[in-house]
């Protein structure tokens, strides 16, 4: 029995399902989830001392790779001064200033402790600002596990086949209107019918929780125009794409300014953190300036600020995101070549340093329906074959993959060698 098997059995005694987030349970791919004990650079090491090239990156935050020495030094330094104050710190202001400098649409920022908290708060703010109740989200897009957003959600909810989680009152769900991602006409038709009731549209500019689906040309620009036409607040959920697709996020890459944005993952450098922000006119409605209440005991935690500030400064160097995107491109080209050589139907998608893998004969991946053409059973076999070859992919056919600046030629070769063997075994 492996160490991971023993630990997983023990974990299930007091932790529901043995994990603290559903996708970690390997329910989609089968087998025993790996328990990790160490991570450095592009690698993670499990409890049985096997090392893997990591394309999960803690689900996105580890853009520098694991255990970057500068980030560790920043955290160690802050440890000497305390873990949490529950009071303002200079680092909170530094973080707000830096986020507003890097992201085109940000004029004011509120720090929180998670991406879910950020999206939940942004939606409450949009409702308070507009005086409207309804929101529009997109099929397969995941914005955290708050009640109003667990309607036709992606991520773990998609993996588990739960379109609307039990425990969400119908009275909550009725205000959440869902339309297909990348279908601008569906949004246009819905707003023509109920636009006066809609407070906001929330969208992942790159849908990263039904694998990785970039926006169709003109789609985000079309959403911006429709929101302007109907007086609807446009929210970009950049918890995943922020500072990864480009330094200024997907909104900078696609040149579209939302009214509000949410961030997480990278801004904490691996620590639990999130933020939301945007137009001063809207953000001034948040307490204590305005009547929309939002608060958090650990918001702006100094350890998270130290790790996040260091991370953002390091990724701000010229050429960083070009290098990250180039590695991702070479990875996907190499995988595609090897799949083609093996006669395996296979499609990839990319947005900067994030990517999607699909065992599908679709000509392109644009919609939720395209995503669902992917052969989940074949991905399951591929996942375990890659694990055997020393490569750790996201344990679900519906999750995006992530690269880091620590991935280089050696990791690329190891990955492609493992993939060549895996594709051959899938014939």
From Swiss-Prot:
SUPFAM superfamilies: PLP-dependent transferases. Its cofactor is pyridoxal 5'-phosphate. The keyword Isomerase applies. One of its GO terms (cellular component) is cytoplasm. NCBIfam families: hemL, PRK00062.1. It comes from Pseudomonas syringae pv. tomato (strain ATCC BAA-871 / DC3000). Its EC number is 5.4.3.8. It holds the Pfam family Aminotran_3. It catalyses: (S)-4-amino-5-oxopentanoate = 5-aminolevulinate. Its main location: cytoplasm. It is found in: Cytoplasm. It is an enzyme of class 5 (isomerase). Belongs to the class-III pyridoxal-phosphate-dependent aminotransferase family. HemL subfamily. Homodimer. The keyword Cytoplasm applies. Pathway: Porphyrin-containing compound metabolism; protoporphyrin-IX biosynthesis; 5-aminolevulinate from L-glutamyl-tRNA(Glu): step 2/2. InterPro entries: 4pyrrol_synth_GluAld_NH2Trfase (IPR004639), Aminotrans_3 (IPR005814), Aminotrans_3_PPA_site (IPR049704), PyrdxlP-dep_Trfase (IPR015424), PyrdxlP-dep_Trfase_major (IPR015421), PyrdxlP-dep_Trfase_small (IPR015422). This is Glutamate-1-semialdehyde 2,1-aminomutase. HAMAP family: HemL_aminotrans_3. Keywords: Cytoplasm, Isomerase, Porphyrin biosynthesis, Pyridoxal phosphate. The modification N6-(pyridoxal phosphate)lysine is found at residue 265.
